[in-house]
């Protein structure tokens, strides 16, 4: 909040914010807007402030890819656990929506679900343990991100279930990519963060120059809207990619996100 106040004081043209708790920034963002400063919500939305742009990875699609991957990995259906991220993170809501939508007509049943406050990975371990108390007849675990998945896999390992239970998550962390080629994680969603950052930078400059961002320039135009709770605001989303052992080399290694040596470090 103090950083945004400083930028307001310095009369910035554009402020890009990445809120951990969007609701907490309501007053200061409204103040920036009242001073004629353009506000871009990056990666996460600040609700009800009528920002000038929301740019993020398509979070609903992230959830859809997770659901589709579990359906593919568990063709006979069965019980699954859903371990979501922080309940104050609006992206979690979108991911959950896409995930549940993807599972709607499947034969997979969410028999246990929980949220991890502040994205604390230890809470994921606790949730998987609680899920296993409900039933150890589980075919898949959806985790809000790869960090949560690391703890889920640890608990599955302790119960001799690692590699037998499909685990899906997001972020394409190095450790997750290693788990995928080693067989203890099924899929991670890769989010092209460099594309997100460069697009946000370009749109920030265009907003600052008073240009119309709905007009295409360098292949980028903003023509969608997202409801922030009170307002439909300009929305630009980046398409995520499901990464499995099959396309790891093509997406992650050839794309320069991680090196082959690092990803296959533990694979003989």
Give names to the regions the model predicted.
Residues 1-268:
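A residue-level marker of the well-folded mature domains of exported/periplasmic proteins
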């Amino acid at each position: 909040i103090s950083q945004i106040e400083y930028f307001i004081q310095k009369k910035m043209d554009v402020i890009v914010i990445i809120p951990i708790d969007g609701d907490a920034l309501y007053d200061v963002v409204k103040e920036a807007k009242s001073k004629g400063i353009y506000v871009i919500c990056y990666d996460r939305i600040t609700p009800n402030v009528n920002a000038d742009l929301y740019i993020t990875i398509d979070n609903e699609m992230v959830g859809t890819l997770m659901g589709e991957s579990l359906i593919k990995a568990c063709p006979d259906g069965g019980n699954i656990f859903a371990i979501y991220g922080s309940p104050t993170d609006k992206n979690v809501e979108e991911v959950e929506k896409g995930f549940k939508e993807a599972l709607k007509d499947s034969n997979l049943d969410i028999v246990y679900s929980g949220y991890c406050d502040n994205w604390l990975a230890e809470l994921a371990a606790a949730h998987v343990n609680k899920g296993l108390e409900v039933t150890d007849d589980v075919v898949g675990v959806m985790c809000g991100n790869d960090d949560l998945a690391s703890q889920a896999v640890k608990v599955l390992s302790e119960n001799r279930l690692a590699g037998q239970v499909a685990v899906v998550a997001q972020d394409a962390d190095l450790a997750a990519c290693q788990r995928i080629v080693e067989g203890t994680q099924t899929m991670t969603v890769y989010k092209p963060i460099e594309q997100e950052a460069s697009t946000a930078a370009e749109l920030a400059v265009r907003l600052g120059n008073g240009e119309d961002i709905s007009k295409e320039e360098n292949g980028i135009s903003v023509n969608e809207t997202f409801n922030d709770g009170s307002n439909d605001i300009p929305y630009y989303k980046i398409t995520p990619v499901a990464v499995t052992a099959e396309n790891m080399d093509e997406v992650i290694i050839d794309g320069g996100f991680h090196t082959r040596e690092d990803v296959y470090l533990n694979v003989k």
